[in-house]
């Protein structure tokens, strides 16, 4: 489904292996003959970042490598800080935004969701619908 999408949200963490895996995924995507980077918006979320700056550093590392070696660019969607409340909510099998809506991670999720919705509203057209994604997916299989 990634290759059939017009919008991709890539979630990575500050760990070197996560950054490497993210780049490897993007490299494989860019090498696909049916991939047209001019028609795809790839956004990045830095997960479990120590700070806002740490999240930006993670994004800048991936984006600079993509620009240099794949001749592409990414958009930064935001970061989710490391937050003990995430683990506590998981252990309680609760949704974080219900378990502790004031936690740092819950507030970051809300900010990211607002950005996604703002982008969706600004770009609401046929190319963004799920039917278009499925149409692209099945047309590429032929």
Protein language model regions, located:
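Residue-level recognition of oxygen-bearing side chains
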Residues: 24, 85, 104
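NTP-binding/hydrolysis catalytic cores, primarily Walker-type P-loop NTPases
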Residues: 95-142
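Conserved catalytic-core segment of NTP-binding enzymes
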Residues: 1-78
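Beta-strand-loop-alpha "switch" segments that mediate conformational coupling across diverse proteins
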Residues: 68-95, 109
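Short amphipathic alpha-helical segments
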Residues: 57, 61, 81, 104-107, ...
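Phosphate/oxyanion-binding loops and surfaces in catalytic or ligand/nucleic-acid-binding neighborhoods
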Residues: 65, 69, 83, 115, ...
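Short secondary-structure transition/capping segments
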Residues: 28-39, 63, 85-96, 120-134
